[in-house]
């Protein structure tokens, strides 16, 4: 029966193959578990080939459940994992796909390697791994795995060499090895034609990619011919409604778009939409389907993006104003459907890595949407369209952080059981910890592959357990998933309602890709009563100057006055001067994007120094004009769950690094810390943990308190993945923790703090992701629930840090907003410093991230003090009047 199934499946008769396998499951006789597992796995393969990926994954899950994890079944289990990885690859959830494949490879390598079926499965796993790395644009890793697959197949006379040849061809094409690419495409085509004939279903896959290669070589007629052949095969094998048919129509549309035949391209894109969406058959290019009934969301997303761009180009050709307006409107509607689909896809991803990958790779989609909305606004002047620009920009930025904050709020709600939440957090922490172990071991000169494999196996099991917990939460608390689906940034009116009249939000959206040497920049300016935006173009000089500024702050020893101040003035001219007249009041809230996140705005120069000036004294920094704070996205500024945080008590932690601890490091003691803490408690009450008491264990206990946290300590940054950056505590008397509080551990915590001060620890640096911003320790505390974080963007001088922090707490104690307090502290420092120390390197590192509202004082205590003073004054007055009366009576 299984042999018959294999023959039918190989021939492309998927309906016949399905009918062949169903009797195994319908049998009333007792069927062995391995037969049931094989039947479910084969049904999954059929559904995957038919483009029904959700059904396929369900069958693979059932196959796994019927396959016990014993040695005789390991081969079957690995085969199921291989198939599951393909589903996750189609969905572009690459980190999960890689995990399944690596698990399968480890299983194959543990078995009898001379078995031809195992060798074939191993070669397929390497092939699939190569495909994933190709999709991730990691072409060197793709070639490494594809060549492993090819060697196994050729050396052992294994089947399906044509698929490996195809993917080698694609990868060589991307690495400019065009002759090799052509050779492998030809080998793949010839192998399939020879073995199966010219209408074999897998031949379409080769024609897809060969056509793309031909088009990139400007061989347009040949590309059109290849894609037409692919369409013919797909229609024959799959019918009108199928993801591969949709892909065929899209490729043909792309071919006509490349030839500037926009009308024909749109016809093909419309047919592609019809093929990928159930219950949609409208050939009118001005009609769009519902995104809720697609066969495959990723395919629909690509189609909508292509159609929207073609509509814009088509509109540019039209002389009829009404038709032009209609076409631009439809382009905007189409790209908005794509954005809605991106949200749906993101919410269905299981891992943060997959969500970040989506954000990075779809950022240009959001930029195109803003561009189309801007074009429409210029044609109509419609205020509703201008407001839509704001909404699109908000969705384009920090979507992963926004989702995570909402998830945390929901997880800590009363509806989720404490045990379930604790189990999920524990698993998340263990997963991150094991990932860190693997990273650290891999960085060694001679990494232990056995230990790495052991940890990866443990990771695999933990991730599957976490998935089950997520399913349990969704099942027991359906509102959880529904609420996540409804996450929307705060509307413009809601932001303006909370803004004060002296506050202005300046929000940047910057393209991460160059287009003919240019990058698009959108600047949104939001005040209490108005909203405006500006569209501008940046060239390579912007990145060059931003890089020079960052380098000057990171390496002050090579700080050249002209090479430093020139970029500070240039960046001001690029980012703030174009919108200066739109700013209201003296408080700026900056929402950066891309490398703008590295720039300290209060150090930007309003005017370039004169040719004779050689020192920093008297320069016109933006600090003199504005109090500046920063945020990841505008909704976060007034996030209700963060605004309600209260706590005036300051809990400070200052380790003594004079002796080596269990962490194996000897760090210099932080000079000036004692004076810094004295200044804090001059204005605020609280408790100080210094030296041996500044342990990770004590901090974890203190995190449960509604207090301000002041952390005067070192941080160790991981330049590759900031999730593994950590704060360094004292370990001398800590028997429970290792003294390293990792960023991922902070993110999984729950804080009730109005402010976390990360003093002298380079806490604002991290990994920069397109669309998400900086992944830093500061971000970890925001995710944990802190209303605001006072952070540093580079290493700071301890004594100057103590001076600025002292001033900050003083002004904060008088009721000043955090951004005002920090500005006044910096101005006080500049006023009292020598010209040699007025360089921004010394004072500009500190920044306010998040809500800058004043810290709430203990009004009950203050009230009692005032009442006591009045009481004392009253007693003194009574005594004075009584003595005066007695004295008067004596005179009488």
Show where each model-derived region lies.
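Eukaryotic all-alpha helical interaction scaffolds
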Residues: 9, 21, 25-28, 47, ...
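Alpha-helical solenoid repeat scaffolds used for protein-protein interaction
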Residues: 159, 179, 183-190, 194-198, ...
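Catalytic-core domains of enzymes
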Residues: 408, 485-488, 529-534, 545-552, ...
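Caspase-like cysteine protease fold
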Residues: 389-391, 399, 717, 724-726, ...
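Catalytic cores of nucleophile-dependent amide-cleaving enzymes
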Residues: 632-634, 639, 707-803, 876
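Conserved alpha-helical positions within TPR/SEL1-like repeat arrays
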Residues: 2-10, 35-49, 75-90, 117-135, ...
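Tetratricopeptide repeat
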Residues: 17, 23-24, 56, 62-63, ...
């Amino acid at each position: 029966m299984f042999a018959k199934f294999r023959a039918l499946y190989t021939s492309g008769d998927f309906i016949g193959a399905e009918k062949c396998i169903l009797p195994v499951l319908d049998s009333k006789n007792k069927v062995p578990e391995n037969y049931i597992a094989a039947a479910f796995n084969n049904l999954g393969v059929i559904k995957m080939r038919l483009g029904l990926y959700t059904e396929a994954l369900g069958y693979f899950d059932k196959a796994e459940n019927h396959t016990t994890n014993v040695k005789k079944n390991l081969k079957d289990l690995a085969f199921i994992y291989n198939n599951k990885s393909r589903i996750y690859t189609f969905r572009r959830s690459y980190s999960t796909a890689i995990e399944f494949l690596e698990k399968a490879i480890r299983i194959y390598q543990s078995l009898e390697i001379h078995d031809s079926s195992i060798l074939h499965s191993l070669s397929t796993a390497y092939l699939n791994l190569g495909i994933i790395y190709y999709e991730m644009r990691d072409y060197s890793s793709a070639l490494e795995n594809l060549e492993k697959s090819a060697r196994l197949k050729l050396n052992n006379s294994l089947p399906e060499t044509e698929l490996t040849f195809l993917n080698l061809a694609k990868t060589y094409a991307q690495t400019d090895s065009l002759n090799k690419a052509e050779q492998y495409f030809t080998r793949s085509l010839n192998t399939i034609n020879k073995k199966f004939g010219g209408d074999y279903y897998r031949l379409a896959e080769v024609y897809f990619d060969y056509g793309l290669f031909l088009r990139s070589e400007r061989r347009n007629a040949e590309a059109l011919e290849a894609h037409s052949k692919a369409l013919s095969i797909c229609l024959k094998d799959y019918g009108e409604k199928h993801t591969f048919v949709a892909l065929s129509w899209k490729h043909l549309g792309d071919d006509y778009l490349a030839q500037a035949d926009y009308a024909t391209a749109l016809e093909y894109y419309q047919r592609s939409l019809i093929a990928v969406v159930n219950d949609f058959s409208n050939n009118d290019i001005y009609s769009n389907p519902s995104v809720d009934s697609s066969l495959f969301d990723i395919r629909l997303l690509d189609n909508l993006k292509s159609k929207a761009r073609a509509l814009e180009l088509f509109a540019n050709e039209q002389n009829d104003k009404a038709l032009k307006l209609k076409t631009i409107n439809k382009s905007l509607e189409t790209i908005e459907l794509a954005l809605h689909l991106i949200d749906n896809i993101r919410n269905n991803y299981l891992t943060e890595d997959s969500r970040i990958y989506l954000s990075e790779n779809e950022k240009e989609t959001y930029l195109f949407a803003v561009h189309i909305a801007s074009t429409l606004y210029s044609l109509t002047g419609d205020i509703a369209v201008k407001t839509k620009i704001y909404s699109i920009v908000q969705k384009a930025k920090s979507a992963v952080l926004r989702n995570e904050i909402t998830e945390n709020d929901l997880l800590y709600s009363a509806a989720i059981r404490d045990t379930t939440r604790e189990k999920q957090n524990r698993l998340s922490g263990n997963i991150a910890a094991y990932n860190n172990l693997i990273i650290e071991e891999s960085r060694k000169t001679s990494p232990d592959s056995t230990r790495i494999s052991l940890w990866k196996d443990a990771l695999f099991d933990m991730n599957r357990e976490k998935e089950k917990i997520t399913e349990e939460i969704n099942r027991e608390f359906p509102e959880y998933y529904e609420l996540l689906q409804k996450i929307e940034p705060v509307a413009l009116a809601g932001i303006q309602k909370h803004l004060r009249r002296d506050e202005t939000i300046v929000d940047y959206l910057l393209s991460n890709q160059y287009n003919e040497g240019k990058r698009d920049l959108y600047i949104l300016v939001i005040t209490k009563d108005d909203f405006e935006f500006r569209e501008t173009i940046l060239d390579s000089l912007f990145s060059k100057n931003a890089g020079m500024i960052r380098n000057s702050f990171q390496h002050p020893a090579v700080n050249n006055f002209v090479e430093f101040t020139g970029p500070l003035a240039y960046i001001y001219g690029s980012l703030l001067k174009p919108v200066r007249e739109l700013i209201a009041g003296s408080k700026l809230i900056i929402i950066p994007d891309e490398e703008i996140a590295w720039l300290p705005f209060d150090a930007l120069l309003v005017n370039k120094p004169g040719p004779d000036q050689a020192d920093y004294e008297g320069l016109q920094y933006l600090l003199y004009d504005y109090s500046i704070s920063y945020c990841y996205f505008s909704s976060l500024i007034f996030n209700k769950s963060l605004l309600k945080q209260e706590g005036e008590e300051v809990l400070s932690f200052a380790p003594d690094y004079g002796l080596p601890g269990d962490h194996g490091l000897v760090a210099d003691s932080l000079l000036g810390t004692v004076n810094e803490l004295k200044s804090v408690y001059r204005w605020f009450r609280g408790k100080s943990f210094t030296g041996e008491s500044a342990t990770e264990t004590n901090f974890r206990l203190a995190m449960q308190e509604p207090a301000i946290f002041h952390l005067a300590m070192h941080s160790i940054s991981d330049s590759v993945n900031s999730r593994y950056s950590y704060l360094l505590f004292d370990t001398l008397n800590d028997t429970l923790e290792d003294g390293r509080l990792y960023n991922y551990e902070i993110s999984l915590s729950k804080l009730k703090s109005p402010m976390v001060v990360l003093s002298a620890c380079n806490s604002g640096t991290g990994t920069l992701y397109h669309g998400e911003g900086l992944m830093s320790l500061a971000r970890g505390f925001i995710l944990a629930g802190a209303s605001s974080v006072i952070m540093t963007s580079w290493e700071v001088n301890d004594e100057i840090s103590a001076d600025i922090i002292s001033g900050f707490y003083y002004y904060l104690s008088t009721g000043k907003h955090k951004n005002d307090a920090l500005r006044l502290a910096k101005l006080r420092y500049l006023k009292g410093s020598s010209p040699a120390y007025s360089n921004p390197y010394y004072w500009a590192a500190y920044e306010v991230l998040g809500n800058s509202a004043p810290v709430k004082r203990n009004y009950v205590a203050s009230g009692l003090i005032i009442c006591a003073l009045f009481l004392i004054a009253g007693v003194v007055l009574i005594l004075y009047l009584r003595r005066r009366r007695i004295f008067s009576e004596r005179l009488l």
